[in-house]
Regions:
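Short, low-complexity, glycine-enriched hydrophobic/amphipathic alpha-helices that associate
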Residues: 23-53
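Beta-lactamase-like hydrolase cores
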Residues: 48-89, 270
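Mid-domain, small-residue-enriched loop/turn segments at the edges of structured enzyme/sensor domains
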Residues: 69, 143, 164-227
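Conserved catalytic neighborhood of penicillin-recognizing serine enzymes
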Residues: 126-164
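Structured C-terminal helix/loop/strand segments within mature extracytoplasmic catalytic/sensor domains
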Residues: 51-60, 168-169, 173, 221-260, ...
């Protein structure tokens, strides 16, 4: 193993992929997002596998009249696409840790650094007043931890200290933002804040934002394209399959169903002074027993309700998409 005591890594060398804005998918023939507005759906040139318009209408009916803004994007088998309320900027919250993991792995790929490289840091450099399973599980004054373990803490348990540490010591917020802009359209997202920045000023949570389709594009590329070395890309995907958070959101209606795998990353916002839940998010890649796969992203913004109510809405949307996909399949 290598011992890593670096303070920073130079700006990532990136190759711009020439992707267009949020209103159109890439030119690989994997479908298109047309319009965006309050709901757009279109399949690929081949016959659609589901009635995308009906799915869009069903989702719109679920979120109609809800006390907040709810945006949805679904991509089925890299082809059929449904979006609802895709035009706004939704706070990502900890969903951005998926973006961060991609940037860290990309940087390590460029430098030929393995993920079992050891990072050393002191307990005094960590925040005891933030969400951090890592800090609770390790009581030592001095830490020696492989970067792979830091990534597991961020992706599986959404650890804020692990995320802050990697931004400060490995790949900065600005570098992460720049790298992701080579993978999805620039106007779909922005990442400018660490967890520590948002904790000190909750209003900064809105600065890390995305459209639902922006997140969906990134999830889709992560699970279906080659954007990293095989080893590191598979590491992120497998780690997201072990996500411990948000079981009552997109995953809820899929629980207990044989042969379904779900990889996802969730985020939870702050409650502001007026009792509004600033954000509640989930981004998932789901594979069914017959090999059908789909990406589903649900972003909730400024919700005048509690987390359980937001989770219930997300679960209903997830169930709607699942039922539409499996309606004509046997044994579902």
């Amino acid at each position: 193993m290598k011992l890593l005591k670096i303070i920073g890594i130079p700006m990532l060398a990136v190759c711009v992929l020439g992707m267009t804005g949020c209103s159109s998918m890439n030119n690989t023939g994997k479908g298109a997002l047309i319009g965006g507005g309050n709901g757009a759906a279109i399949g690929a040139a081949t016959a659609a596998t589901i009635d995308t318009a009906a799915v869009r209408d069903s989702i719109s009916a679920i979120i109609s009249g809800m006390p907040g803004e709810i945006g949805v994007a679904a991509i089925i088998d890299s082809r059929d696409t449904v979006t609802v309320n895709d035009i706004d900027k939704y706070a990502l919250m900890s969903v951005f840790k998926m973006h961060q993991a991609i940037a860290v792995c990309h940087s390590f790929d460029l430098k030929g650094i393995p993920l079992d490289t050891i990072l050393e840091f002191d307990r005094t450099s960590l925040n005891p007043d933030t969400w951090s399973p890592m800090l609770k599980e390790h009581q030592d004054a001095h830490f020696r931890m492989p970067v792979s373990e830091l990534l597991r803490y961020t992706l599986m348990q959404s650890d804020n200290n692990a995320s802050n540490l990697m931004f400060d010591r490995l790949v900065s917020v600005a570098e992460t933002d720049s790298l992701i802009a080579t993978l999805i359209p620039r106007n779909c997202f922005r990442i400018t804040e660490r967890e520590s920045d948002m904790q000190s000023d909750h209003a900064k949570s809105y600065n890390n934002h995305s459209s639902p389709s922006g997140v969906a594009r990134l999830v889709e590329r992560l699970f279906t394209d080659s954007i990293l070395s095989t080893e590191k890309q598979e590491f992120i995907c497998e780690t997201m399959r072990g996500c411990h958070t948000g079981a009552d959101r997109i995953a809820a209606p899929l629980a207990g169903k044989d042969g379904i795998t779900i990889a996802h990353k969730t985020g939870s916002g702050y409650i502001n002074e007026t009792g509004i839940l600033t954000a509640y998010t989930d981004a998932a890649y789901i594979t069914l027993p017959d090999g059908t796969s789909y990406t589903l992203v649900i972003l909730v913004k400024d919700f005048a309700g509690n987390e359980k109510q937001a989770s219930d809405i997300m679960a209903r949307i997830s169930d709607t998409v699942y039922r539409a996909i499996t309606r004509n399949k046997p044994n579902n």
